[in-house]
UniProtKB/Swiss-Prot annotation:
It is found in: Symbiosome, Peribacteroid space; Symbiosome, Peribacteroid membrane. InterPro entries: ConA-like_dom_sf (IPR013320), L-lectin (IPR016363), Legume_lectin_dom (IPR001220), Leguminous_Lectin (IPR050258). Its main location: other. The keyword Signal applies. Involved in symbiosome development. It comes from Pisum sativum. Coiled coil: none annotated. Keywords: Glycoprotein, Lectin, Membrane, Signal. This is Nodule lectin. GO terms for molecular function: carbohydrate binding. Glycosylated in a boron-dependent manner. Glycosylation is required for localization to symbiosomes. 3 different glycosylation variants, NLEC-1A, NLEC-1B and NLEC-1C, have been identified. Glycans are attached at residue 134.
Length: 270
C-alpha cells in the first residue's frame, strides 16, 4: 500500500479511503485482520475502553477531557484516553512481516473556555497501556515526564509551544518521546471539524498522514518507521488529550483496518 500527495476534494478523498478500508477488511481469509468503524457510540456496546476523564456524550461522541466550564481564572488538569478494546496484531515473529493499516478519525477542539494549551494525540502502544504517571498537560497522557522509558508511536496535534517544540502550533510524529521527529504546521480553527487519515505501509515502513481541514485544505506528513523495532507484535491503539485551561476535545468518528500475513497464510501461499 502506498501513500501519495493528492489534489482530490475532501469528500472524494475520504470516500477513497473508505473504499481502501472495505477492500482490506474483505481480505481476511489470507491474513490476520482487525477492523472497526465507530460513529455514534453507546455505553452498552461501544468497543472502546475509556481512561481518565474520557467518556461517551449523550450525542454519541467521545469527549476526551472534561468539558464543564471552570470558574473564572481557575483551571484544572484534565486528561483522558479512548482505546480500541481489541488488540491489534502488528507484526508476526515467525515471518518478520509487519501489518499495514489505515485509520481515520475526525475531531473538534473548542478553545472558547480559556487560553489554549496542550493537545491531542493518536497513539500505538503495548497492550494493557494505561495513563502514565506525570503525563498530564504537555505530555498528552502518553509520556511519563519523569522517565526516559516510554514506548509508543503517535501523531500529535500540539496547541502550545513548549521548550522542545518548534515555533507555533504543529502536527508531529512521535516515537517514544513527546519531542517530535518530524512536524508540520497545525492550522487550528476552534470549533471546526478536522479529519485525519493515517496509513502505515508495511513494505516501505512508512507512516503517512493527511490532515483535512473543514475549509478543504490538506496538510501531509510522513516518516519512515520500522514498527517492529519500536513496538511489540501486539498493540493497542487509542486517542488521548490533555489540557490545563479548559479547551474541549471531542471525537466524532473513528475507523481502523489492518492486515497481517501470518505464518499459516504465508505457508499456504508458497
Amino acid at each position: 500500500m502506498a501513500f501519495y500527495r493528492t489534489n482530490l476534494p475532501t469528500r472524494e478523498l475520504f470516500s477513497l479511503v473508505s473504499v481502501v478500508i472495505v477492500l482490506l477488511a474483505t481480505n481476511i481469509n489470507s491474513v490476520q485482520a482487525l477492523s472497526f468503524n465507530f460513529t455514534k457510540l453507546t455505553t452498552a456496546n461501544s468497543g472502546v475502553t475509556f481512561q481518565g476523564d474520557a467518556q461517551i456524550l449523550p450525542s454519541g461522541l467521545i469527549a476526551l477531557t472534561k468539558s464543564s466550564p471552570f470558574p473564572p481564572g481557575q483551571y484544572f488538569t484534565t486528561v483522558g484516553r479512548a482505546l480500541s478494546s481489541n488488540l491489534v496484531p502488528l507484526w508476526d515473529s515467525a515471518t518478520g512481516k509487519a501489518a499495514s493499516f489505515v485509520t481515520s478519525f475526525s475531531f473538534v477542539i473548542d478553545t472558547t473556555e480559556g487560553p489554549i494549551t496542550d493537545g491531542l494525540i493518536f497513539f500505538i502502544a503495548p497492550p494493557g497501556t494505561v495513563i502514565p504517571q506525570n503525563s498530564t498537560t504537555p505530555f498528552l497522557g502518553v509520556v511519563d515526564s519523569e522517565t526516559s522509558i516510554n514506548r509508543f508511536v503517535g501523531l500529535e496535534f500540539d496547541l502550545y509551544r513548549n521548550s522542545w517544540d518548534p515555533e507555533g502550533r504543529h502536527i508531529g510524529i512521535d516515537i517514544n518521546s513527546i519531542i517530535s521527529t518530524k512536524t508540520v504546521t497545525y492550522n487550528l480553527v476552534s470549533g471546526s471539524l478536522t479529519k485525519v487519515i493515517i496509513i502505515y505501509d508495511s513494505p516501505s515502513s512508512t507512516l503517512s498522514a493527511a490532515i483535512i481541514y473543514e475549509n478543504g485544505k490538506i496538510s501531509t506528513i510522513s516518516q519512515v518507521i520500522d514498527l517492529k523495532t519500536v513496538l511489540p507484535n501486539t498493540v493497542q491503539i487509542g486517542l488521548s488529550a490533555a489540557t490545563l485551561t479548559g479547551e474541549s476535545y471531542s471525537i466524532h468518528s473513528w475507523s481502523f483496518v489492518s492486515d497481517l500475513e501470518t505464518t499459516a497464510s504465508y505457508v499456504s501461499n508458497i
